[in-house]
Amino acid sequence: MDRRHRFALQAEIWVADHLAAQGGLVLARRWRCRGGEIDLVVRLGGVLCFVEVKARGGNSWDSAGWEAVGAVKQRRLLLAAALFLAAHPELARSVCRFDVALVGRDPGGGVRLVAYIAGAFEGSGR
């Protein structure tokens, strides 16, 4: 596993632990299907959150992080979320949200949360 991949995995674990510490229940990590992959599925309060974790080693973020997940990636996440819900019918009536966690390296080489964008995009995939 190369350094970038290792950091991305470390970032996903860190975000899952961070959300769990806030009372979230992590239902799935790196859930894969024919439509793609969902980094994290977390029940946070009464909301089912599909979380995309974006990790960058430096300060290579746009000003608000909005460019981290483009329209193509949004459509893939929407398809993957629909397939996740089909595979878990007990969750099908959940209120769902698509969140993006922007993660960077701290000066010591560890993980730091740059931004957590709850409701980063709507279910339309635009």
Curated annotation (Swiss-Prot):
Signal peptide: none annotated. Pfam families: UPF0102. InterPro entries: Restrct_endonuc-II-like, tRNA_endonuc-like_dom_sf, UPF0102_YraN-like. GO terms for molecular function: nucleic acid binding. PANTHER family: UPF0102 PROTEIN YRAN. Belongs to the UPF0102 family. NCBIfam families: YraN family protein. This is UPF0102 protein gll3754. It comes from Gloeobacter violaceus (strain ATCC 29082 / PCC 7421).
